[in-house]
Amino acid sequence: MNSPLLDKSLDFSTQIVLFYEAFSKSKKDTTIAKQLLRSATSIGANINEAVYGNSKADFISKLHISFKETGESIYWLTLLKRTNLTGYDFESLLALTEEIKRMLIASLNTAKENKRTPYVSQFYKRITSFLYPIDIKNCHLENVTV
C-alpha cells in the first residue's frame, strides 16, 4: 500500500539500519548510533500503529510519539555529524527527517482541528488514506469496529 508518510519513514528507517550495521562493525563506541537506531525506527512503527488506533485520541497520540521521535533522531544525527565519529555525511538523513517531521506536523494539526467530529468521519478517512491507504468499505475483518 502506498503512503507517502509511511514510505518516507520506512526509507528513513532502512537507511538508519544500514548505517548502524556498517558503523557497528567498526571498533568505535556504538552508544549514540544505538540511540539513533531506536528513535529512527520508532517513527515509522508509531505511524503504522496510529493507523490502527482504537480512537482519534489514540491516533493523535501515536502520531505525536512519532513527532517526538523525529526530534530525538535529529538530535542524534546532528551529534554524530558534529563529532564526525563516522565520517558519514548526515545531510540527506537530516533532510529526510525534517521532511517526515513536517508531514507529521500537518497530520497532527489536521487531526487536532477535527478531533470533535465523529470517529469515522471524512477527515479520518482522508488522513488514514494519506498514512496508509485502505478501502475501509471493503475491509472485512471479524470483531473489528471502524
Task: Describe the role of every protein-language-model region.
Residues 1-45, 49-146:
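Short, C-terminally biased terminal segments at protein or domain edges
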